[in-house]
Amino acid sequence: MELLFDVGNSYTMVGIHQDGKFLTWRIGPSSFESEDGLFVIISNLLNRVNVDLNKITLAGISSVVPNVNFILEQMLKKYFNVEIIFVGTKNKINNIAYLVDYPKEVGADRICNVIACKQEYGDNVIALDFGTAITVDVLEGGNFVGGAIIPGFKTAIGALFSRTAQLPKVEIKIPEYHLGKNTIDNIQIGVIKTTLYGIERLIDEIKRERNKDFVVVATGGDMSFLSSKISIFKHYDPYLTLKGILYYSKEIKKL
């Protein structure tokens, strides 16, 4: 049994992998104030679903928030008898080369996404991860060849709210029309629809530039309630990043 952590900017996804299935929970940044407090939160979550902590043999971690890594690692060392593995580009997993200017700068979440994509969807895949930032990651010929980073929906809406005097903070929703008749509609159309249209155009241009078709896979918390309403991707995989953490950790354990 594996315990997995996808540490993001807005929240951390905690996952248990057992018998080919994932159980997941979200915890907020305040959960990482101390190693003891973090253990209480994690153990309570696992106890609710009758997970025997002694049967967990591996902890895999993808983190884009370095300042929580120490507390997380210390908690695991103190309370779990597990091998702890952090995701990074140092080890070549699934024979993926990172053909970019600075491979060490590629985020752990993006590494996990391309590893999972290659494992499950093939050598030519575009991964879209809708979170605090929207990442576009391109796997071509089985290697990571680049991508893009875009402000996430909540990030963009939050920026409008914090930097203007009268614009409200609105929920993430896709209006059925393209001309807003009130402020909320205007923001939703302006932020969400134009972002999605921009990503769709970007994907088309990547395909044209590389002269290749790609399977498009989406993941991320902000996509869970929009996946049935848009068609810019072929697959929605809510566990894509966790799968990547799992594949990475198991391969490292073999070394």
UniProtKB/Swiss-Prot annotation:
The active site is at D109. It comes from the Bacteria. One of its GO terms (biological process) is coenzyme A biosynthetic process. Signal peptide: none annotated. Homodimer. PANTHER family: TYPE III PANTOTHENATE KINASE. This is Type III pantothenate kinase. It comes from Petrotoga mobilis (strain DSM 10674 / SJ95). The lineage of its organism: Bacteria, Thermotogati, Thermotogota, Thermotogae, Petrotogales.
